[in-house]
Amino acid sequence: MMKWFEEVNRTRPAVICSRVRLVRNLEQYAFPSRLDGKLAEEMIGRLEDGLKDLGSADGRHYEQARLQELRDLDRRALRERRVFNSTIASGKAPAGVMVSDDERVGIVLNGTDHIRIQLFASGLHLDELWTQAGLIDDYLNERFDYAFDDKYGYLTSFPTSVGTGLRASVVLH
């Protein structure tokens, strides 16, 4: 299966890739920076159980792993492919990761937020990525209660993500 970063973009050569990221937190748990190890393990287990059938909902196959169980080489490879950042890669707190076979979808559990959904595509495809991110978000929202405030929106670890929890970006040549 071809990975997103192996595709050749001939339609808009200046746009290397697109990314859409959604962050969410669960209502009943403290933010990851305030969550003790035992509760973090419990939450990750609940999220992994809730996500185990995600592939049947979006047609992808996912690999699931705990970051602490990955070899250093695998962590570095996932970091280089921007599945997670260096803070999460080097962190000691319990964390989980799910990656689709084509590596277009990466989901980090208990990183800087409880859930970080990230989608990539070669070229300019923000609308398509947003649609796919929304489907995954809906899937999760049917199974878990998000930390949400009527005035502020989705509550996140960083003030810049409060509200929609959405960040969309493109890498240009």
Where are these regions (language model features)?
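Structural signature of FAD isoalloxazine-binding scaffolds in flavoprotein oxidoreductases
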Residues: 173
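Conserved phosphate/anionic-ligand binding catalytic regions in large, soluble enzymes, centered on
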Residues: 153-170
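Long, Pro/Ser/Thr-rich low-complexity/intrinsically disordered regulatory tracts in eukaryotic proteins
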Residues: 1-151, 166
